[in-house]
From Swiss-Prot:
Superkingdom: Bacteria
Keywords linked to the UniProt accession: Ribonucleoprotein, Ribosomal protein, RNA-binding, rRNA-binding
HAMAP family attached to this UniProt entry: Ribosomal_uS15_B (MF_01343_B)
Protein name: Small ribosomal subunit protein uS15
SUPFAM superfamilies for the chain: S15/NS1 RNA-binding domain (SSF47060)
Spans annotated as Disordered: 1-26
Protein family (similarity comment): Belongs to the universal ribosomal protein uS15 family.
Highest classification ranks of the organism: Bacteria, Pseudomonadati, Pseudomonadota, Alphaproteobacteria, Sphingomonadales
Length: 89
């Protein structure tokens, strides 16, 4: 369950720090969040798809690592990102 190229380009454009930015932690977290949300919808109808569930858990762990890195490097960017993506309650 991947996202389309158009959707990915839109996510990159919305979260890029400057033009051509595709590798910053903000962009990577936003892409992972979009993929995680897509897989979450997939699991509502395919409850026993354990192969994809493993991929989901790996994505969640990767996102957690990137968020930890960003919080350590720049707290302000971290707070802005989680507010924008709605990750924390």
């Amino acid at each position: 369950m991947s996202i389309t190229a158009e959707r990915k380009a839109e996510v990159i454009k919305d979260n890029a720090r400057d033009k051509g930015d595709t590798g910053s932690p903000e962009v990577q977290v936003a892409i992972l969040t979009d993929r995680i949300n897509t897989l979450t919808e997939h699991f509502k109808t395919h409850r026993k798809d354990n192969h994809s569930r493993r991929g989901l858990l790996m994505m969640v762990n990767k996102r957690r690592s990137l968020l930890d890195y960003l919080r350590k490097k720049d707290e302000g960017r971290y707070q802005a990102l989680i507010a924008k993506l709605g990750l924390r309650k």
